[in-house]
Amino acid sequence: MDRMEGPPDVVVRRLPLYARSLRYLLQEGVESVSSQELGDRINVTAAQIRKDLSYFGEFGKQGIGYDVRRLLQQIEDILGLTQEWPVALIGIGHLGEAIARYEGFRQQGIRIAGLFDSNPTKIGKAINGMTVQSFDDAERVIREQGIRLAIIAVPARNAQEVADRLVMAGVRAILSYAPTVLQVPEGVWVRYIDPVAILHSMTYYLARDIAGVRHNNPET
């Protein structure tokens, strides 16, 4: 059976930006916000915000705006953040260790549930209250804990093998920092963070700015 068609991926990618801005508004004591005010914070038009939200139902009232707390709760519900998601982190080099130490995950529904590496010098190391385990144990731990999310922070040459084993263990969503494209089965979602590729996309705009070519600001 085909999956139900959902909103465009670019819309889903903007929802966390809306949620983050709404959290800031709550911290500032703001109770109500217009689509224009929200859009100004993240470089998105008011019309785009209204269109994005329309994929998921009706939000706010015309002329009144959005109740900040309620809209945040609704977006968190859409994103599945009403529950905590355990995550397996593979690769505990400098980058992986920094990710493991990041305190912002748990505050937003994400819990690093296991640290794994194949380097004997890393195995057994204590990081942020957890112990690095052998990657050979990852499949068992993932199955036992029902982990569906994983972060890959390994060299490109190892990334595909790691992804294959994660998928076999039941992982269905992967965030990869490895500078390579992963081949995964249908029904497995992959996102990439490649700082070099992102910087190259920014040098495109810088080069044209230096040359005097006018262009719109890239999407936030």
Swiss-Prot record:
Cellular compartment(s): Cytoplasm
Residues annotated as transmembrane: none
Keyword Transcription: yes
Keyword DNA-binding: yes
Binding site residues for NAD(+): G91, I92, G93, H94, L95, G96
DNA-binding span(s): 17-56
Span of the signal peptide: none
A GO-annotated cellular component: cytoplasm
Description of how the protein assembles with itself and partners: Homodimer.
Function noted in UniProt: Modulates transcription in response to changes in cellular NADH/NAD(+) redox state.
Entry's family note: Belongs to the transcriptional regulatory Rex family.
This protein's name: Redox-sensing transcriptional repressor Rex
Species: Roseiflexus castenholzii (strain DSM 13941 / HLO8)
